[in-house]
Amino acid sequence: MALIIGLTGGIGSGKTRAADSFRELGIEIIDTDQIAHELTRSAGKAISPIRIAFGDCFILDDGSLDRSAMRRLVFSDETARHRLESILHPLIYQETLQRLPLIQSEYGIVVVPLLLEIDGYLKLVDRVLVIDCPEPLQISRTMLRSKLSEQEVRDVMAVQCSRDKRLAQADDVIVNDSGEQHLQRQVEELHRKYLMLARKHGL
């Protein structure tokens, strides 16, 4: 199997933008947030167990998950959050496992916001890449992008591991605090490094 990089970072750190930059260089990306969206859209595999666990009030008329209502619930009710995670996390993990052997690029990237928090993912990856930025920037970016309140962003951050812990676990770090060009330079530098590692990995 190809060399696999686990890409992670806190909310608002720029994981998606970094992953898109690697994709533009020809690298295949498995995005667990995207998988979660697929699982919770109309007729997705997670809809039936979510309906059973939480009721019809969390399912929209089109059959997809009401993400806003669910977000409000899980960040005010830890038991509900654990119940949702017990449904989603195994499904996301199994889908990731199925996609990994299909990667055809010289190396692959798995984007996992909770890479360090959820058991199992670290054993799937060969290196951990952390996208990092100061916490005030995480908050302001997320509020601008997602229309969440500052408290809602902080609630998300509270269930993610700390910035210090992420950085301590990182094999590689991209500092995303200075605009697109700064990010792109770091991506291209790591891309060259990963290509060399991938060739050794395949020997």
From Swiss-Prot:
Keywords: ATP-binding, Coenzyme A biosynthesis, Cytoplasm, Kinase, Nucleotide-binding, Transferase
Main location: cytoplasm
Entry keyword RNA-binding: no
GO cellular component: cytoplasm
UniProt keyword Transferase present: yes
Name of a matching Pfam family: CoaE
UniProt GO MF annotations: ATP binding; dephospho-CoA kinase activity
InterPro entries listed in its UniProt record: Depp_CoAkinase, P-loop_NTPase
Superkingdom classification of source: Bacteria
Cellular location(s): Cytoplasm
SUPFAM superfamilies xref list: P-loop containing nucleoside triphosphate hydrolases
Pathway linked to the protein: Cofactor biosynthesis; coenzyme A biosynthesis; CoA from (R)-pantothenate: step 5/5
Residue ranges occupied by any DPCK domain in the UniProt entry: 4-201
GO biological process: coenzyme A biosynthetic process
CDD domains found in the cross-reference section: DPCK
Enzyme Commission number(s) of this protein: 2.7.1.24
Record: residues binding ATP: G12, S13, G14, K15, T16, R17
Catalytic activity annotation: 3'-dephospho-CoA + ATP = ADP + CoA + H(+)
Record function comment: Catalyzes the phosphorylation of the 3'-hydroxyl group of dephosphocoenzyme A to form coenzyme A.
HAMAP family associated with the record: Dephospho_CoA_kinase (MF_00376)
PANTHER family for this protein: BIFUNCTIONAL COENZYME A SYNTHASE-RELATED, DEPHOSPHO-COA KINASE-RELATED
Recorded family membership: Belongs to the CoaE family.
Protein name as annotated: Dephospho-CoA kinase
Gene: coaE
